[in-house]
Amino acid sequence: MPKSCYNETIEFLERVDVFLITPTYEWQFAPQVEDVDFTKIAKKAGLGPEVARLLFERGIQDEESLKKFLEPSLEDLHDPYLLHDMDKAVERIRQAIEDGENILIYGDYDADGMTSASIVKESLEQLGAECRVYLPNRFTDGYGPNASVYKYFIEQEGISLIVTVDNGVAGHEAIELAQSMGVDVIVTDHHSMPETLPDAYAIVHPEHPDADYPFKYLAGCGVAFKLACALLEEVQVELLDLVAIGTIADMVSLTDENRILVQYGLEMLGHTQRIGLQEMLDMAGIAANEVIEETVGFQIAPRLNALGRLDDPNPAIDLLTGFDDEEAHEIALMIHQKNEERKEIVQSIYEEAKTMVDPEKKVQVLAKEGWNPGVLGIVAGRLLEELGQTVIVLNIEDGRAKGSARSVEAVDIFEALDPHRDLFIAFGGHAGAAGMTLEVEKLSDLSQVLEDYIREKGADASGKNKLNLDEELDLETLSLETVKSFERLAPFGMDNQKPVFYIKDFHVESARTMGAGNAHLKLKISKGEASFEVVAFGQGRWATEFAQTKKLELAVTLSVNQWNGQTALQLMMVDARVE
């Protein structure tokens, strides 16, 4: 090879990282505020200055709030009777039990709805109630109260009281029908409240304008748990494993009451007596005593959600509340298989949708017949991460397009579409996500509305979502003790994110693929005398580029890898860029 060509090749290889290793997120460094007094307080609690800085930045800034954060207590749970209409709800349910009425618990088809319904079912049965649980089918019943389902249960099964869990505040038609048939409806919900509320017998909701409940961010299962505590007149500790699952699955704020509920709930999960949960953990290859919030978020919740995404969600109630070993095993196996099927369906739609992307468009509106509407939100989220654009993925059936949107931070999808409700048969959502149904003929109008919105706003349509970097890590002083110190901030989740660290000035010693289909990547990096492994899920195809890249910078989280009796510190890659 001529020397000039050789030099050009070397220069290209040195530049190749710039083209191929590009960050998924816009990196944002947290302010490094060090408060001397709080650092001393944190030191007394056994926390180093780096943890103190992070806590201070997250609003934990005095001794009392630190103690409550590090040592959550059930005694700090708020009085359930502070919730709007709790007294009316409890009185009506007790009356129904005393009179032997048939009660319907009407839930939702996701993990929060499943656990909410299970919580209320077990509580009512403790009081001797005759109750029936129904979780609506996503495909035939839709979300929330369904008038025809209500009518069926009232007429065919003699239901005279309906208690909704994790739904109801938008169920005007069904609730009006039930009330007109002489059946009271008690709504327990946590979703955004419409301007006009349904005419229900009672509405128990943490954000109700006529009450001042101290914590607004309970999940549906949290509200159900509050009802259970009020009915049974004490904190129902044995229900907290269900509360933890629903709360983590619904990605609500893990602060205040939710932090308490999840902390205790995870402990309960560690020695759960629920045979269905034991079966699920066994099938996922997880020992009960190893359960943490990530186990729920990545193993238990997706399995429960898969059932509601693809099929009838009602077997989940038998799984969570049943006592039959054989039945629990069969349902857990069926749910496991549904989850595997869900993964295959998502991958198939994702690959098909990718071929439909229009590079000229600022927002991708992708619609096709034959796509399972239960998984389109997942597909839209994956495409958003890959493209850095707002994505809407819709299934076409009988002349209508129904699906989900996921949006970058720079584009408020709800603000963009809310003024154009005439486009939709149904529409709802918030800044980052939305669900919608519209006539197929209006798809081009939908696309144009979004393109116009972006142009008029001057929004950065390809703006990446922000990644908050908490601190820069010194690899040469990093140890297992560092990990343990930060783990005292767990459980992690919304508003208490797992700390993300910035590392640079290290040497990549090796990069190798791992996992099924070589999908994942493991780097060995070093700095001075220190060396660590970095695991990067889904990055296997970039092994060569990572091995050759100079001046690599990583955003990572810390974890502990236990294998064959050995314990080692491991870094988990969140994002990568080149300096």
PLM-predicted stretches and their roles:
Residues 21, 30-35, 40-161, 181, ...:
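Hydrophobic helix-and-loop "lid/oligomerization" segment in the mid-to-C-terminal part
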Residues 21-22, 98-99, 327-331, 337-366, ...:
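Mid-to-C-terminal polyanion-binding domains and interfaces
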Residues 151-221, 225-230, 255:
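Active-site cavity-forming subdomains of large catalytic enzyme subunits
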